Amino acid sequence: MASFVDRVIVHATGGNGGHGCVSVKREKFKPLGGPDGGNGGDGGSVILRVDGQSTTLLGFHHAPHQKAPNGEPGKGDMRHGFKGQDLVLSVPDGTVVKDREGNVLADLLGEGSEYVLAAGGQGGRGNAALASPKRKAPGFALLGTPGEEQEVELELKSIADIALVGFPSAGKSSLIAAMSAARPKIADYPFTTLVPNLGVVQAGDTRFTVADVPGLIPGASEGKGLGLEFLRHVERCAALVHVIDCATLEPGRDPLTDLDALEEELAHYAQDIADEDPSSIPLTQRPRLVVLNKVDVPEARELADFVRVELEQRGYPVFEISTASHEGLRELSFAMAALVSEARAQEEQREQQRQTVPVLQPEPVRRRRGRDRREFVITREDRAEEPLYHVRGEKPERWVLQTDFNNDEAVGYLADRFAKLGIEDELFRIGAKPGNAVLIGPEENGVVFDWEPTMVGGAELLGGPRGSDLRLEETSRPTRREKREQFYDRMDAKSEARAELEQERRAGVWTESVDARDRRRTSETKETNEK
């Protein structure tokens, strides 16, 4: 079972925002209490935070899917929903966050460094927050927006000052165990070290970290052995230490050929790093120390003395050591400390230069009055010989997600927001006509509707004045003139009905009773006498 993982794929999802509440205050002796729907809470975010106690990404290997809690919906009586708690994920120091295309999103260095991996959704506003002098009691609320979804690759690059590289069984693990309190696995067979080991070394007043990575062999850049998989852990090191086995009995191997093979494999890996990050110092240009190990063996000491001169002619500082007898370890530790101190001083100098360089402050952005067309972009596309107008922008897309399309009043409110933002004016300007299809948002999950300008549509959709709640509207009383017109209309309708019945009676369509005939004749006689 894996105990060390330095590269994982993580699927992070922020919590959804809670929906706003639609509520009207109900209280005795207050028939028009007004809206009191609360706002929904924001969804929780997924946050990566550097934890000094964390040393591996093993937890994400077992649980790659991480989702933050949702925000709670709003309630009546002005009760707002609780915000979803942020999901904080602990990662080791030196974790690099990349997207699926390999672009670096964040490089987390230092205790407490954070990166928001997936932001939570925004909570919807309740109808109390949407009330205005013109919209006193909204009958709708805004929905909460969904949280962000992101799939990233987490890659661990160990934070060490010195890196030990060499062939398998060269004594790298024995060296780090002899110089520090680290206790890596040590055995007499190749590839005993399968994961990087870190050890802290104290040399005088300098304290630094040494990293031991799995061994390299010729052809590692082509995938032989363990390949170059673990060399990412030496990218941050200030110096490299080549550990050469002088007691090996393998044919065709000697300290010089081993060193040349290591340099060749490092050059292949350095090219890959340069392609990803051109600003980093290549591995081939970093300081180096050559350690000739196992000189406690007589034949190994003779070989070390033989190749030492040529190595020094190449410009390498050479140290003859023995991890068994601890010979030469003190001199080696102080040489490492000198390289680390020099690298730290150079880093401090570069940091001071970055601070002293004047920073050009951009001109403050002043909010423009009126509409800003930069908040959205409209493009025309021809689909099946019909024009389609595609609207993209942070505000329009968020407003669509917040709209409950089952509520006509909410749809009217969305149309008002679009009109104030200037989308309708822009559609008119580029030649859109009523009835054309308009797509808001991305292709895969956008909203498509037939465009009808608000000047000709809106109130018809709501069945009443848009932006008001018909439940709280006072019934308007008809005027005296309207009552008179309604009375005359009813009298004319009755006269027309009586005339139609008389024509049917005379035509013999129906006959009247004796009592009805007597009443009719009496009425006619009375009308004649009055005339």
UniProtKB/Swiss-Prot annotation:
Basic and acidic residues composition-biased segments: 468-507, 514-531
Cell compartments where the protein resides: Cytoplasm
Domain Obg: from-to ranges: 2-159
Cofactor: Mg(2+)
Domain annotation OCT: ranges: 368-453
UniProt: GTP binding residues: 166-173, 191-195, 212-215, 293-296, 322-324
Subunit (UniProt): Monomer.
PANTHER family in UniProt: DEVELOPMENTALLY REGULATED GTP-BINDING PROTEIN-RELATED, MITOCHONDRIAL RIBOSOME-ASSOCIATED GTPASE 2
Similarity comment text for this entry: Belongs to the TRAFAC class OBG-HflX-like GTPase superfamily. OBG GTPase family.
Its job: An essential GTPase which binds GTP, GDP and possibly (p)ppGpp with moderate affinity, with high nucleotide exchange rates and a fairly low GTP hydrolysis rate. Plays a role in control of the cell cycle, stress response, ribosome biogenesis and in those bacteria that undergo differentiation, in morphogenesis control.
Protein name in the entry: GTPase Obg
Encoding gene (name): obg
